A protein has these predicted regions:
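Phosphate/diphosphate-binding glycine-rich loops and adjacent basic-rich segments that engage nucleotide
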Residues: 1-47
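Glycine-/charge-enriched secondary-structure boundary and capping motifs
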Residues: 41-42, 47-178
Length: 178
């Protein structure tokens, strides 16, 4: 019944975020523009991306979370799942919420990957707008009761993923980044 997950998410649920491996093939129109407009070289390293070439950082393979998430579903009361793809947090998280529900995402509760800091700097994209374009280091979110959050995170970490509580579902609308 997870397909109708939006009907299960409740005010008070938390969102556990699973770290992304990078851009995950979304937002590449902007990426190409940033690279082109700034004369960036895919074969060069930049301080923002910590010793990797820009090409390596941009082409980091997309994480696939199926096995890990199935383990969480088997052991926790999952109310909703959202893959953070094109449209970032703003378009993807609301898909699992009912009307009248929103989230306040706690920036700093996960690592924003260096490649996003580079794109923000050179692309002169507003920080808040970055969350509307990119995954910003979160590839997927799982909505579940707060009492299941620690267990879900432990399962994900046992599978080699980085995960953390990003937000709580609140009364309201949309996604707020705090």
């Amino acid at each position: 019944k997870l397909i109708d997950a939006g009907e299960r998410v409740k005010v008070g649920d938390v969102l556990v975020g699973i770290a992304s491996s990078g851009v995950h093939s979304n937002g590449f129109s902007l990426v190409r523009k940033v690279v082109s407009d700034n004369g960036l070289k895919l074969s060069e390293t930049y301080p923002e991306i910590e010793g990797r070439t820009l090409g390596e950082a941009l082409l980091e393979p997309t994480r696939i979370y199926v096995k890990q998430v199935l383990k969480v579903i088997a052991e926790c009361d999952v109310h909703g799942i959202s893959h953070i793809t094109g449209g970032g947090f703003d378009e993807n998280i609301p898909r699992i919420l009912k009307d009248g529900q929103g989230v306040e995402v706690k920036e700093g509760s996960w690592e924003i990957l260096p490649v996003f800091r580079l794109l923000e700097k050179y692309g002169k994209v507003g920080h808040r707008e970055m969350f509307n374009i990119f995954n910003m280091g979160i590839g997927m979110v799982i909505a579940l009761p707060e009492e299941d959050a620690a267990k879900a995170i432990a399962i994900l970490e046992e599978c080699g993923e980085r995960a953390s509580v990003l937000s709580r579902v609140i009364e309201g609308e949309g996604v707020t980044i705090k």
